[in-house]
Amino acid sequence: MTTRPHIAVIGAGAWGTALACATAATGADVTLWMRNPVPPRTRTLPRLPDITLPENVTITGDFPRTANVVLLVTPVQTARDVSTRLQTVLDPAVPVVTCCKGLEQATSLLPLDVLAETMPGRPTGVLSGPNFAIEVAKGLPAAATLACADLALAQKLTALLNTSSFRLYASDDAAGVQLAGAAKNVIAIGAGITIGAGLGENARAALITRAVAEIGRLAEATGGRASTLAGLAGMGDLILTCTGRGSRNYSVGLELGEGRPLADILASRTTVAEGVLTAPAMLALARKHNVRVPIIETVTRLLNDGVSIEEARHLLLDRPPTRE
């Protein structure tokens, strides 16, 4: 008798719940870890209340000791704490795949760099792509990139997690995939601002396109490949996050563009818009590597320095012309 694979999902927010549903479609036994667990037979969770969890998903408040793979689906800012505790109980051979997007605010570290400190020697990877949680949870067609420094591991994990509705592509550019996933949240805020402020579709298209070049420069400076920006984790995620109203970061930008104060926007939300915290950390990372990131810098100044939208417009458009 063949033993069914065991997949552990750490974090039961919207994306964690969606990934539990998606991976359950592989036929594996899925464990979904919650910080404050509900009764084990509960089939609906607060972040996606219209979704019924498959029967092969088990909810728990205990970290797994063994699994074929662990998906870490916590916010970036809590990944250090959770992964440190997970490391003490999890078999050292079990790979951990981070599914969060952003930079640790205090250190400007990408998620896998955090795991390198908290889980030294462990095989790790990153999963990222143009995915709204509710659509993945419903089983609608979607795709993403799973990247590991070891391509063979990435291929093994994509074979384990791939389904007929959630298609995964293997990559060995973990640095580029992470960087793209983090930066797109910042760019999405800028894209939302352009529409909310009535600057037009042309402005949004220009911002997204120039952001690809900007993120590509930063990816290369941090050990990634600019070519990764042409894939699902780059352009795919940018298009979705910068145009879809289901994007938390884009919707923050929309409200900012309409004139609502940032503090009021954040106070009214129960979910995290990672781009708000990632923006200053991303700018610090770019300055560390001497990379020009005018869009990221302008969004950061809008969020943190009181720069007006009109001033931001001139900061971007009044720069000397350059070649593309």
Swiss-Prot record:
Pfam families: NAD_Gly3P_dh_C, NAD_Gly3P_dh_N. Its EC number is 1.1.1.94. It is an enzyme of class 1 (oxidoreductase). This is Glycerol-3-phosphate dehydrogenase [NAD(P)+]. GO terms for biological process: carbohydrate metabolic process; glycerol-3-phosphate biosynthetic process; glycerol-3-phosphate catabolic process; glycerophospholipid metabolic process; phospholipid biosynthetic process. Catalyzes the reduction of the glycolytic intermediate dihydroxyacetone phosphate (DHAP) to sn-glycerol 3-phosphate (G3P), the key precursor for phospholipid synthesis. Sn-glycerol 3-phosphate binds at residues 101, 129, 184, 237, 247-249. PROSITE patterns: NAD_G3PDH (PS00957). Belongs to the NAD-dependent glycerol-3-phosphate dehydrogenase family. The active site is at 184 (proton acceptor). It catalyses: sn-glycerol 3-phosphate + NAD(+) = dihydroxyacetone phosphate + NADH + H(+); sn-glycerol 3-phosphate + NADP(+) = dihydroxyacetone phosphate + NADPH + H(+). Keywords: Cytoplasm, Lipid biosynthesis, Lipid metabolism, NAD, NADP, Nucleotide-binding, Oxidoreductase, Phospholipid biosynthesis, Phospholipid metabolism. It is found in: Cytoplasm.
